Design a protein with these regions (language model features):
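A structural signal for small-residue-enriched, beta-sheet-centric alpha/beta enzyme cores
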Residues: 1-90, 94, 100-408
Length: 408
């Protein structure tokens, strides 16, 4: 049985968290800007990173630190990306060293992340000086996870925090996560930080496999604005304190773990898509009847990434032609004359296109459907049985305002 629970990254046994203001965000002393997540014991660890060729300094450091598949803690700051700036890797290593000193572990056992403005030298001194207070603030509580979630926010308007509980090998296993992401989010990961914790016992090899299988069908299926960031990191720590037999191969226990991990990451991905900068609507695009899953995914990603489709949803305009247009330039091979399109929400479900041709439909009802916060675009391709769901958001005037003065 899989259940959603409270606790975020502190839901699993043996994890503590904290988030405080140290001064990275010089313009907002009331905003937390450094987070720390610590396990009481060493963890199996894995991470996936941005596919952008331009990578932030912490990513290079993390790849080296995670080469052995182990970690003890995560330190992350907001307000500065530590990307394309002098002494980037040196400063990232200094953050790791400061955290390691407080915790009592090796710097190589620390994962480091940053998010914020690109191209400015990070003030690592205020982070180093703030780590003792950050460490002292560590707790295993809902409030501590909440503080860490707030400390990694940039243009986010709400925290992203989820936890789940399941059974693996007869033992209760918990996992939780916090994430940030509101702009520069696009399939294949984009300005998104996501930190996951679990007390499941699982080998480094299998947790890496599970993370890769999960990211592909969750975070890589969201889009806010089509920009892929320099800093994306999704990292998972597993400390084994649940007491289950260590998962070392695929089987029933692995399947149970994977199901929970996917549920956790799907919920976090949806929260990020819904909190797109200035967004008023969460758009869920489900493609069914595709020849294969790759085709379904290509089409769904194209639709949620379409600026014109986003604008239509913002205006509650049932311009289904923009959906077909986005499908057509997606690169997927399909027959447009087999395509059906519906719009749906809590207000109802209405067919607007059948076999590639427009239908007469109730404009007033459609307007009502598209005015709801959660809007679905349902596409049937009529060529097979494969399906895929992707998530995005509308684009509003506020998106321009937020990004027009981001550095201020």
């Amino acid at each position: 049985m899989l259940n959603f629970i409270e606790g975020g990254v502190c839901a699993a046994q043996g994890f503590r968290a904290a988030g405080i203001h140290v001064g990275v965000k010089t313009h907002a002393a009331w905003k937390k800007d450094v987070a720390l997540i610590v396990s009481d014991v060493d963890c199996a660890a894995a991470a996936v990173f941005t596919k952008n060729v331009v990578k932030a300094a912490p990513i290079h450091v993390d790849k080296a630190h995670l080469a052995d598949g182990k970690a003890r803690a995560i330190i992350a700051n907001s307000g500065n990306a530590n990307a394309c700036a002098p002494h980037g890797e040196e400063n990232a290593e200094k953050m790791c060293a400061a955290a390691a000193k407080a915790i009592g572990c090796k710097p190589e056992d620390i994962v480091v992340s940053s998010t914020g403005v690109i191209g400015q030298t990070i003030n690592v001194q205020v982070i180093e000086e703030g780590v003792p207070a950050l460490y002292a603030a560590l707790e295993r509580s809902n409030e501590a996870s909440d503080a860490a979630a707030h400390a990694i926010m940039t243009t986010d308007t709400v925290k992203k925090e989820v936890a789940v509980e399941t059974t693996v090998g007869g033992k209760t296993v918990r996992m939780g996560g916090i994430a940030k992401g509101s702009g520069m989010i696009h399939p294949n990961m984009g300005t998104m930080l996501c930190f996951l914790t679990t007390d499941c016992a699982i080998s480094p090899e299998m947790i890496k496999t599970a993370l890769l299988e999960t990211v592909g069908v969750t975070f890589n299926r969201i889009s806010v604005d089509g920009d892929t960031s320099t800093n994306d990191t999704c990292c998972v720590l597993a400390n084994g304190l649940a007491g289950n037999e260590t998962i070392t191969a695929k089987g029933p226990d692995y399947d149970a773990f994977l199901t929970a991990l996917r549920a956790l990451c799907t919920a976090l991905a949806q929260k990020m898509a819904a909190d797109g900068e200035g967004a008023k609507h969460l758009i869920t695009c489900t493609v069914s009847g595709a020849a294969d899953e790759a085709t379904a995914e290509t089409v769904a990603k194209s639709v949620i990434s379409s600026t014109l489709t986003k604008a239509a949803i913002f205006g509650a305009d049932a311009n289904w032609g923009r959906v077909l247009c986005a499908m057509g330039y997606s690169g997927a091979a399909f027959d447009p004359e087999k395509v059906d399109v519906h719009f749906a929400s809590a207000a109802g479900d209405i067919a607007v296109c059948a076999k590639g041709r427009g239908l007469d439909f109730d404009e007033a009802l459609t307007k009502k459907i598209l005015t709801e916060h959660d809007v679905e675009i349902l596409i049937t391709m009529g060529e097979g049985s494969a399906t895929c769901t992707c998530w995005g958001c509308d684009i509003t005037y506020d998106y321009i305002k937020i990004n027009g003065d981001y550095r201020t």
